[in-house]
Amino acid sequence: MQKIALCITGASGVIYGIKLLQVLEELDFSVDLVISRNAKVVLKEEHSLTFEEVLKGLKNVRIHEENDFTSPLASGSRLVHYRGVYVVPCSTNTLSCIANGINKNLIHRVGEVALKERVPLVLLVREAPYNEIHLENMLKITRMGGVVVPASPAFYHKPQSIDDMINFVVGKLLDVLRIEHNLYKRWRG
């Protein structure tokens, strides 16, 4: 079973992280999950859910505490065995910390370790509009080998619901790591 690390921050759009978690479970990945304190607040605010409710029934998920720097995810010698690391959604604070090597919590540490060990790192940055600092930090991440994905759904697949739009973005996240899926119709041209 392949491993994925998924970090969910407190940016608006926690639903992207939840959907990615559910799809990875369906695709039989083992997921190591780090949920920030603010992500729990946002989930409650945006969807009236708790993470306990979201995690119910998921078998291949291992939870790591946001401030546990002894987690195996904090170690490069362990993280190299992962298919990749997702930070979904990624707050601009988390983007800044990862881009500048500041480790305030396990999510920041996992991002930094992924970059230093060349483990694929994918950040779904959820902010609008971007300012110069955001763009510079995205450029830093990209230059270090990470991939920054905007939370921007397309419309060529003619979405009929919010779920269709979420599926498109999550599908793009999976595409970055070359994970097969059927979440949206591909462009036919």
From Swiss-Prot:
GO MF annotations, alphabetized: carboxy-lyase activity; flavin prenyltransferase activity
InterPro entries in alphabetical order: Flavin_trans-like (IPR036551), Flavoprotein (IPR003382), UbiX-like (IPR004507)
SUPFAM superfamilies documented for this protein: Homo-oligomeric flavin-containing Cys decarboxylases, HFCD (SSF52507)
Binding site for dimethylallyl phosphate: 156, 172
Catalytic activity: dimethylallyl phosphate + FMNH2 = prenylated FMNH2 + phosphate
Binding positions for FMN per the UniProt entry: 10-12, 36, 91-94, 126
A Pfam family that the UniProt record links to this protein: Flavoprotein
Keywords for the protein's UniProt record, in alphabetical order: Flavoprotein, FMN, Prenyltransferase, Transferase
Top-level enzyme category: transferase
E.C. numbers: 2.5.1.129
PANTHER family listed in its UniProt record: FLAVIN PRENYLTRANSFERASE (PTHR43374), FLAVIN PRENYLTRANSFERASE PAD1, MITOCHONDRIAL (PTHR43374:SF1)
Similarity remark: Belongs to the UbiX/PAD1 family.
HAMAP family reported for this sequence: ubiX_pad (MF_01984)
Function: Flavin prenyltransferase that catalyzes the synthesis of the prenylated FMN cofactor (prenyl-FMN) for 4-hydroxy-3-polyprenylbenzoic acid decarboxylase UbiD. The prenyltransferase is metal-independent and links a dimethylallyl moiety from dimethylallyl monophosphate (DMAP) to the flavin N5 and C6 atoms of FMN.
Protein name (record): Flavin prenyltransferase UbiX
Native source species: Aquifex aeolicus (strain VF5)
Lineage: Bacteria, Pseudomonadati, Aquificota, Aquificia, Aquificales
Gene responsible for this protein: ubiX
